[in-house]
């Protein structure tokens, strides 16, 4: 059964591919790691020339490019892409440190779908990517995880929270509960046991969809504010893991 937009879905689906074009190694790594932590497949190149070479052999779902690049700039890159029928429809987001206020108009005129000024937060990047390439954009940041869980205190040892957001979670289990049923779920997060009351909004049985884990998407109905704050912090730390700045302190 299909899942609502704001509740995490099962894993194992094919990852969408994003290309990051940035000559600044730190910025390129930051953007790449955040996108990977959100579950996307990412390739990073440092120039427009490298980007065009790569685009000749692979077509990404999205290109995120710096305007200021060594050699060709982002405007030239977008112009070359628009002239190539194979990649002309690939959306381009410009994410730049360029201080020139006229840059936005120039990039939009060249064909970029969105213009972002650095630094860009992980939440803003997530929502931008969701809005552009996902069929059902999600309002809440969700991250993949693997937390041992217990539903109604009867954990079998084979139930895990595999995706989590501020609004809900996906529980991987061979025994999904009935749609609309409410359950007490506990899971360990950073050495603390979190208890939530959650309702089943959609399920996947074993073998129903080969690309989906069996289990259930659950919406939080009741959760302590302190526990919700822990989940928010965990999500922030998860999507910033591996970046030069690392998780926020």
Language-model segments: which ranges?
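Structured alpha-helical
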Residues: 1-249
